Amino acid sequence: MLVLLCVDGQTDLSFLDRLQQCGGLQGVTNLTVVPRFTPDVADAVRQKARAYWPDAMPDDAPGRIILLDPRTLPRRHGLHLLLDALCRQTGAVLAFGDDMAIDRHGQVSDPWFKPGFDPLLAARGMLPGPMTALGLDRLRNPLAVWASLRGDNTEPDDPLMTVLAAVSRDEVLHCPHVVAFRFERAVRPRRQIAPPVPDPLPTVSIIIPTRDGWDLLGPCLDSLGRTDWPVAQREIIVVDNGSSDPACLAGLARAEAAGSVRVLRDPRPFNFAALNNRAASLARGELLVFLNNDTLALRPDWLGVLSAFAWLPGAGAVGPKLLYADGSVQHAGLVFGLNGRAVHVHVGLPSDGGGYQGLATTSHEVSGVTGACLALRRAAFEAVGGFNEGFPVAYNDMVLCADLMKKGYRNLYVAEPLFLHLESRTRGNLDNPEKHRREADEAARARALHPDLFAADPHYSPNLSLDAPYVPAVPPRRRPPWDLAGNPSPPAD
């Protein structure tokens, strides 16, 4: 087994002694140190490790290698877990696992139980992690990766990013076990760079169902009127589902006469999915934005932010961070399977609160976003047939997101607080037995449509509980290899 230790000018050379003492390199036959940026230090570490790094990729280069950050200790079984996962998965090029912090007394804390691979998290340095296994013989251009590992480029680069740029997401495998300990308590992410706004700008249709409630809809429309998107390339469609309140009827008439909205009258019994589907079929936008009437836009550039993420390759539903009126988090993505339902996570955090490993303040892939503010390209919406009208009140947004994932789209949470959401003020909360029964029924039918997603949300680690979000599962929901082999416990660390 070959382990590549990536070092820089700040590396403590005693690190190699710690590796050997902890047994983390048990079974390693070749420890090679990658010289990074500082030749003197690289030479010293080379000598201490009694290893070398060839200038050119040799013909007998190993097929499997481990990339190891010097601030990391492998668990005794960690290297083997990664290599085993890489070898078992046909087509996998890179495997990564979970990690925990460790202090100088050997106490562990701060587990980072990771989701499946996510390019947005990888671009921020939160994935893959400090120890990864690489199938060098499976790369289409191994020479470029070899050069990056040696630090041949004029500008220092991250060899992992070079690898990730050369592979597809299906070739990156997550091994959901703690494989390494890190000497830093928390992940220190790079600054997240927002994607560019589409050029040319797409036409946008904003669709808002309502029945009465002008005290909510009026301020919502006022906030949308401050949007900086060109007026000629946006439209607001209000679906009037049988309003009878004079104030609402008068307000809609004024807005329609002013040309600021189109009013689509649809007095059928309330069916959120059907109302939105009909409006979408009559809309002219390339980008569809479904919005509750109890929302308030907080920034004039909100459409630019959402459209930028919606135009990323493979993007499905896109939803921003939503805040309650008091400024705390109402929505920061959905996790499927928690207590058998699809559940909002990070609810109640301060607007700038990081939540679990900073996910609340990091745009990333999720399995679902709320229909209270949901943007997606028309092509993606039509590819799944729109909202499932068998879910008239609840779970229509979650089923839409699940349908998109099944078609290969990726749903995205945008960690920008773009709207206030006065949650369910128009329909009320689930405050009576009938509403509870209906919500439970729609949850059960959603599980029946997408059982695999509710059983194992790919964006939520199996090491995390299904009883409460982002707390460790006891025991973990994924059995480790030694358990499958009939051994009750792992090798001791």
Question: What function would you assign to each model-found segment?
Answer:
Residues 77-109, 169-170, 295-341:
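Conserved donor NDP-sugar-binding/catalytic core segment of glycosyltransferases
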Residues 19-57, 225-268:
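Acidic donor-binding segment of Leloir-type glycosyltransferases
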Residues 108-138, 273-274, 281, 337-379, ...:
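A recurrent flexible, glycine/aromatic-enriched loop bordering the glycosyltransferase active site
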Residues 65, 288:
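Short aromatic/hydrophobic "clamp" motif used to bind/position activated sugar donors
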Residues 1-24, 180-226:
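N-proximal low-complexity "stem/linker" segments adjacent to membrane-targeting elements
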Residues 138, 150-176, 302-306, 360-385, ...:
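A short, conserved alpha-helix in the catalytic core of glycosyltransferases
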Residues 41-54, 267-274, 280-283, 297-298, ...:
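A short, glycine-/small-residue-rich helix N-cap motif at loop->alpha-helix starts
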Residues 1, 186-205, 316, 326-327, ...:
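C-terminal, non-catalytic tails of nucleotide-sugar-dependent glycosyltransferases
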